[in-house]
Amino acid sequence: MYVLLANPRGFCAGVDRAIEIVKRAIETLGAPIYVRHEVVHNRFVVDDLKQRGAIFVEELDEVPDDATVIFSAHGVPQAVRQEAERRGLKVFDATCPLVTKVHFEVARHCRAGRDVVLIGHAGHPEVEGTMGQWSRERGPGTIYLVEDIEQVATLDVRQPENLAYTTQTTLSVDDTMGIIEALRARYPAMQGPRHDDICYATQNRQDAVRDLARQCDLVLVVGSPNSSNSNRLSELARRDGVESYLIDNASEIDPAWIVGKQHIGLTAGASAPQVLVDGVLARLRELGASGVSELEGEPESMVFALPKELRLRLVG
């Protein structure tokens, strides 16, 4: 049994930035620091930050007056920002800059009076944050959420000639392209973003897992069950005809999965740290893996700046 590692895998620039914001805020201002929603969707990361002094809450009414609060990488509705400002809370915004780009697109279309179709998963924090950029006070348009291609057939927008679309950043690239094509067929005048809203890391990890699936008879994806991008990786492998499982850590591996398998692929979602991948590798070696190699993949060098107040000051 041989293990192949996908490349790239694991943390993206937005996740790195969000986690570092929480760590630096605790170091700079002291605990506790409040974080609205899980800063990234990974249990290991959240538990580690809790031990450092982060307190995770779902809404701002759980945050005391005069406290510091961090918005998660998924972004927040405008109403949440306004509430934080009204209460005088100190805020650090860990929203991924690529999600912020989508927020700006929605706000721009809103001001222009357009209808907007958001392609995404209902209930996901990123979708809730993006939907929350819309305000009837800004313009006469309407925002619609479409989750799959079947919903396009029943979609009835108010302004078919004044329509734009945008997407959640962590979707399946193939599924999203299919939905966009169906929308364009139904609404030929629909506008789109200049560049795809699906982020570089999502695209790269999906390309990498497909490369992995072509060479393996089992693909393990390290990621938490509430991680959208991690779920998409496992789905893609299965869609390509390969058995695949999403696991939080090495303890979730069922030895029965690897019986008779010759090549096991291993990757990780954008919110899963390398330490969990290392743990899975160690467990696979215990179960008989004889070697490990890493596939070639798209190099990633993107880095997002931290808020000025949290940047390290160089002395000397």
Swiss-Prot record:
The active site is at E126 (proton donor). Binds 1 [4Fe-4S] cluster per subunit. (2E)-4-hydroxy-3-methylbut-2-enyl diphosphate binds at H41, H74, H124, T169, S227, S228, N229, S271. Its EC number is 1.17.7.4. It catalyses: isopentenyl diphosphate + 2 oxidized [2Fe-2S]-[ferredoxin] + H2O = (2E)-4-hydroxy-3-methylbut-2-enyl diphosphate + 2 reduced [2Fe-2S]-[ferredoxin] + 2 H(+); dimethylallyl diphosphate + 2 oxidized [2Fe-2S]-[ferredoxin] + H2O = (2E)-4-hydroxy-3-methylbut-2-enyl diphosphate + 2 reduced [2Fe-2S]-[ferredoxin] + 2 H(+). The keyword Plastid does not apply. One of its GO terms (biological process) is dimethylallyl diphosphate biosynthetic process. Isopentenyl diphosphate binds at H41, H74, H124, S227, S228, N229, S271. It is an enzyme of class 1 (oxidoreductase). Catalyzes the conversion of 1-hydroxy-2-methyl-2-(E)-butenyl 4-diphosphate (HMBPP) into a mixture of isopentenyl diphosphate (IPP) and dimethylallyl diphosphate (DMAPP). Acts in the terminal step of the DOXP/MEP pathway for isoprenoid precursor biosynthesis. Belongs to the IspH family. This is 4-hydroxy-3-methylbut-2-enyl diphosphate reductase.
